[in-house]
């Protein structure tokens, strides 16, 4: 099985017009004397070789996922296009993602980071650069801005508005502060305008991703909490009244409703004072159009790269017209194309003034279950539904040869997946460890191949043997199965939310309509806008109305499913969107979390154990992972998205100019700045 998957991966990356270079396959096409030359990086080209345009330059980007308007933080959800907007608007994270396994301090932001153990807790002391400002060029960014960011995001006031602050639960003092039992966040200290510290709970150490512990983006207190300031006390940091003579702190839920969620001025939809490479100049919630212009005061990303394209526009793109719209000039760039029909049309434009880029996906497509309620709360029902899906046929119909079925919580671009396939190993590995690596495969994962008889057996064993009258279910007579749950009968009814105009969701529904009713399921399908689906998925209106839906996600910088599954699955918000509460799964995720940094073998072993438990429980129904394609005009040069960073990171290195006859080949950015930190479920995508 492992060899077959690896072979298919190779076909995807070599034979399907993906254009893998000699460098990326490990082969060399240069004489030995030239092989030692340092490769030209995207940063080299961006800083040295980009031409300066005499006229303003503009790029219009099309993405199949329309923005939802969450431009402040991912604490209320992670629509992929919202995440792209945030990456453009919010910068100066303390840490940058230098590879798929490591964060480093961003040298443009941080002078030094030192660590020491205090009372068993690892304490990180951060000294900042002194020339950071927001996009107005007048408001300085100091240690207070980072401390305010932590106080704000971990606050009970934000939680009352539905924010998921689980990212911050590793900070000492979080529990008391978040619960409203303490006004201070004891694990954070403010030394001066340039220096502050963050203490991490001992029971969260070690942490495989190490410096991800200090992930933090600055936010302006003058905008989000006017009248407030940050002070340090002997017990930690806290918010205080800007007027020292006034004891009442003007930081309330009602105040945040105004500063965050006001539809015309709120920081969620219209963040004006920001720190990233671009500034927001316009947002139309109806059309989904978002406009940006350069932030002239931006210092650069972790490699010192600043963007040169003057303005950007992000628009929703529709699968049936997007390639023609690219050819007609409506778009300059199409991002994250998945549908095989779109990809094949896009590939036809190559050599006609357009270029194709591709990269393996870190995430996967899946059917989401609301595991906190209804028939789908039972593992046997989820497994039965899995046996009613012909995943291989679905993947072939939807992706053709541009994707693969998956059977767990993983994507084909993750190093852990590649290692389990046998196609990736650490650079130096002993013979003994090599044998251990060879034993780590995905072969134990159940594929849940189409088998309606097995599905029926699972239902019967789980007690779905009654009819509406509480008597024995008789096939051919009764249509819907029931189960006695407590004193009541539960109907085997699934309400599926199908995103309007979504080809993948249509294929899934068609399959389920052909299998589920014959087994005694009732399947109700609601065709809804993507924004409505997301509102329900994130429980923004309380209890979820839908039992299933089709979605896709990309795992972001930190693959840490502990935070994704450790929260109470019945609570509203972004935490544990599967709704499943399983102690064993959480403990397996925690073992991954607490793997020592750079201990790849142990992490892989823990990762595989987690995947096997996930595959058994099916918090979601995994379907596929795939190769992404971006298509763009060849006027957009030095643009090279990759598995680890999307178009907002790649656009910093790009420029817009008439292509020369001997254009400099694009080189991939080596990483992203980690503006959005994924901790399990990442960005949510419409495909």
Model-based region annotation:
Residues 212-306, 311, 452, 457-461:
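Gly/Pro-rich hinge or "lid" segments in bacterial periplasmic/extracellular proteins
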Residues 41, 60-117:
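N-terminal lobe/hinge region of extracytoplasmic solute-binding protein
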Residues 162-254, 423-427:
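Surface-exposed binding/hinge segments that line
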Residues 388-433, 504-513, 539-687:
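Detector for C-terminal structural segments
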Residues 293, 377-514:
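Append "and occasionally in soluble cytosolic enzymes with long acidic Gly/Pro-rich linkers
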Residues 205, 209-211, 396, 464-498, ...:
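Bilobed periplasmic-binding protein-like "clamshell/Venus-flytrap" ligand-binding domains
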Residues 111-167, 191, 197, 325, ...:
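Aromatic- and charge-enriched surface segment that lines or borders ligand/interaction sites
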Residues 264-269, 297-345, 522:
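Ligand-site clamp/hinge motif
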């Amino acid at each position: 099985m492992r060899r077959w998957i690896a072979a298919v991966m190779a076909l995807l990356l070599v034979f399907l017009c993906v254009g893998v270079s000699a460098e990326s396959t490990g082969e060399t096409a240069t004489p030995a004397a030239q092989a030692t030359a340092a490769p030209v990086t995207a940063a080299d080209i961006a800083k040295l070789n980009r031409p300066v345009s005499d006229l303003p330059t503009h790029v219009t980007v099309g993405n199949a996922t329309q923005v939802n308007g969450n431009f402040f933080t991912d604490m209320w959800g992670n629509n992929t296009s919202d995440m792209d907007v945030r990456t453009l608007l919010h910068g100066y994270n303390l840490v940058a993602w230098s590879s798929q396994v490591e964060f480093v301090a961003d040298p443009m932001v941080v002078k030094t980071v030192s660590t020491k153990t205090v009372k068993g807790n690892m304490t990180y002391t951060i000294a900042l650069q002194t020339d950071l400002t927001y996009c107005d060029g007048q408001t300085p960014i100091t240690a207070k801005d980072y401390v305010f960011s932590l106080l704000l995001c971990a606050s009970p006031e934000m939680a009352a508005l539905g924010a998921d602050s689980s990212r911050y639960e590793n900070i000492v003092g979080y529990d008391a502060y978040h619960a409203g039992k303490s006004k201070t966040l004891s694990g954070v200290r403010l030394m001066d305008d340039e220096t502050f510290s963050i203490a991490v709970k001992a029971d969260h150490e070690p942490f495989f991703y190490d410096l991800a512990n200090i992930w933090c983006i600055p936010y302006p207190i003058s905008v989000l909490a006017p009248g407030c300031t940050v002070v340090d006390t002997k017990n930690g940091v806290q918010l205080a009244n800007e007027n020292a003579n006034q004891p009442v702190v003007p930081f309330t839920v009602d105040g945040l409703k105004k500063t965050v969620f006001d539809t015309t001025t709120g920081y969620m939809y219209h963040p004006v004072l920001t720190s990233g490479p671009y500034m927001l100049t316009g947002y139309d919630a109806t059309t989904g159009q978002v406009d940006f212009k350069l932030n002239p005061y931006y210092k650069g990303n972790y490699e010192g790269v600043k963007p040169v394209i003057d303005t950007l526009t992000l628009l929703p793109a529709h699968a049936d017209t997007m390639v023609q719209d690219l050819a007609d000039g409506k778009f300059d760039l199409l991002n994250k194309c998945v549908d095989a029909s779109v990809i094949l049309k896009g590939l036809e434009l190559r050599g006609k003034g357009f270029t194709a880029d591709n990269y393996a996906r870190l995430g996967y497509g899946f059917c989401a279950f609301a595991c906190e309620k209804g028939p789908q709360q039972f593992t046997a029902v989820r497994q039965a539904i899995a046996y009613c899906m012909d995943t291989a046929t679905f993947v072939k119909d939807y992706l053709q040869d541009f994707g693969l079925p998956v059977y767990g919580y993983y994507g084909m671009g993750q190093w852990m997946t590649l290692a389990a396939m046998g196609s990736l190993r650490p650079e130096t590995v002993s013979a003994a460890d090599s044998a251990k690596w060879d034993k780590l495969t995905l072969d134990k994962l159940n594929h849940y191949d189409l088998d309606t008889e097995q599905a029926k057996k699972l239902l019967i064993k789980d007690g779905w043997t009654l009819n509406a009258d509480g008597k024995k279910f008789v096939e051919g007579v009764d249509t819907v199965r029931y189960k006695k749950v407590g004193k009541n009968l539960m109907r085997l009814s699934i309400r599926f939310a199908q995103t309007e105009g979504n080809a993948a969701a249509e294929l899934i529904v068609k399959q389920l309509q052909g299998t589920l009713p014959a087994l005694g399921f009732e399947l109700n399908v609601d065709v809804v806008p993507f924004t409505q689906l997301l509102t329900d998925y994130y429980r923004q209106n309380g209890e979820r109305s839908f039992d299933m839906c089709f979605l896709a996600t990309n795992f972001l910088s930190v693959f840490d499913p502990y935070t994704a599954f450790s929260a109470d699955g019945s609570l509203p918000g972004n935490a544990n969107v599967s709704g499943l509460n399983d102690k064993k799964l959480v403990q397996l995720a925690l073992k991954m979390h607490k793997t020592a940094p750079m201990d790849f073998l142990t992490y892989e072993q823990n990762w595989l154990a987690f995947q096997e438990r996930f595959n058994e429980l099916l918090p979601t129904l995994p379907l596929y992972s795939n190769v992404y394609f971006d298509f763009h005009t060849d006027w957009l040069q030095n643009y090279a998205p990759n598995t680890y960073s999307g178009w907002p990171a790649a656009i910093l290195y790009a420029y817009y100019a008439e292509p020369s006859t001997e254009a400099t080949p694009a080189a991939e950015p080596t990483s992203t700045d980690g503006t959005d930190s994924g901790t399990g479920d990442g960005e949510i995508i419409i495909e």
